[in-house]
């Protein structure tokens, strides 16, 4: 019982043991007798202090990442995206699904479900990632063609076909990649003589950055959104 309740991230196992001793934990309306009590978290109604807990086997979070945070669980060089989450979520062992550069903003998923996270990042599944980008200079249709054909960068990096869609004056665009290489968007843009001045990820697969989610804030994914991720990653 203590392990089940602690997995929600709301309480530590020590706190759960104290709550059980105080008679504040109910399972299907009956007081839990011991931290070692067994229950099926998928079907049992577990309440603490009168509040029914929502059990999630795995946790999935959408974060609108701000600039200045590292996509890591811990890093001595500066604050990480985990610092943007409350303590009860950090207790659940969440980690970022892939990486965004420190100065890149936008959609970042965090989870404690390693298998699905691995599948989403696997080159075998080619999950699209879309970025909004602002550059110094002007992009043209010639750049769109070069992206579509695949770029061979001077540092030896070979990039697969990517979609570049220009916005208005050509200093802004959307880029869709089907692979994930180190600093890829920045390196591709630099190779065309249009260095990136701002970068934001807006989509991963069929999951779009929530337009109502403020920068630096997070929300839980819905059950349907998680199922959609399983489908596009081949995990179903």
Predicted regions and their residues:
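Basic, flexible Lys/Arg- and Gly-enriched helix-loop patches that mediate nucleic-acid binding at interfaces
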Residues: 1-236
């Amino acid at each position: 019982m203590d392990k089940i309740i602690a997995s929600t991230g709301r309480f530590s196992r020590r706190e759960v043991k104290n709550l059980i001793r105080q008679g504040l934990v109910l399972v299907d309306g009956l007081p839990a007798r011991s931290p070692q009590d067994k229950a099926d978290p998928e079907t049992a109604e577990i309440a603490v202090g009168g509040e029914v807990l929502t059990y999630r086997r795995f946790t999935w979070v959408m974060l609108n990442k701000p600039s200045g945070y590292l996509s890591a669980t811990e890093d001595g060089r500066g604050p990480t995206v985990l610092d943007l989450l409350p303590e009860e979520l950090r207790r659940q062992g969440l980690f970022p699904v892939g990486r965004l550069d420190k100065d890149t903003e936008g959609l970042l998923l965090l989870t404690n479900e390693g298998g699905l996270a691995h599948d989403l990042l696997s080159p075998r599944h080619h999950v699209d990632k879309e970025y909004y980008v602002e550059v110094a200079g002007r992009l043209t249709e010639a750049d769109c063609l070069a992206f579509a054909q695949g770029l061979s960068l001077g540092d030896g990096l070979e990039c697969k076909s990517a979609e570049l869609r220009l916005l208005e004056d050509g200093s802004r665009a959307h880029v869709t990649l089907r692979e994930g290489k180190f600093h890829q968007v920045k390196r591709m843009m630099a190779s065309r003589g249009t260095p990136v001045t701002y970068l934001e990820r807006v989509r991963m697969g069929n999951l779009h950055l929530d337009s109502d989610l403020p920068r630096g804030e997070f929300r839980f994914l819905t059950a349907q959104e998680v199922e959609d991720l399983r489908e596009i990653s081949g995990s179903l």
